[in-house]
Amino acid sequence: MLNEVKGKLIISCQALPDEPLHSPFIMGRMALAATMAGASGIRAQGMADILEIKQNTKLPIIGIVKRNYDDSEIYITPTKKEVDELLAVGVEMIALDATNRPRPNGEKIEDLVAYIKSKGVETMADCSTIEECYEAE
């Protein structure tokens, strides 16, 4: 997937429950509009939205799940549970928070990345510093 999108536009099609555009139907239409506008990939949140987006475009999808945990500030694909949800809907790439903060349940980013790669799926690191980028690499 990386070669397909490198140097090209990836459009994020996401809306959370408290946002006005929250709806799998709307996200599917946003992804269709992104496709028509020349996007090379879609970044999407949650199983329902991703399944709807797949009905509207053949573009590769970078999947995330945003979920809060009491024992961690990590919010973007924080645990194996969210990774498994994304694997179940067949995304081409999974993005994870790769900041230097503790993950929920004591999980480790290295273990999640190894697990994702063992399933043949690419990973993307969401980082907040140059140092985190080097570590994620």
Model segments located where?
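Short, acidic/turn-prone active-site loops that include or flank metal/cofactor-
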Residues: 66-70
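Active-site-adjacent beta->alpha loops and helix N-cap segments on the catalytic face
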Residues: 20-24, 43-62, 73-80, 98-116, ...
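Conserved, mostly hydrophobic/aromatic
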Residues: 34, 53, 86, 136
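N-terminal amphipathic alpha-helix/helix-capping segment at the start of soluble metabolic enzymes
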Residues: 1-21
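Short, structured coil segments at secondary-structure junctions
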Residues: 57, 89-90, 119
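Hydrophobic faces of well-ordered beta-strands that scaffold small-molecule active sites
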Residues: 7-13, 42, 61-65, 94-96, ...
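A short, N-terminal amphipathic alpha-helix
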Residues: 32-38
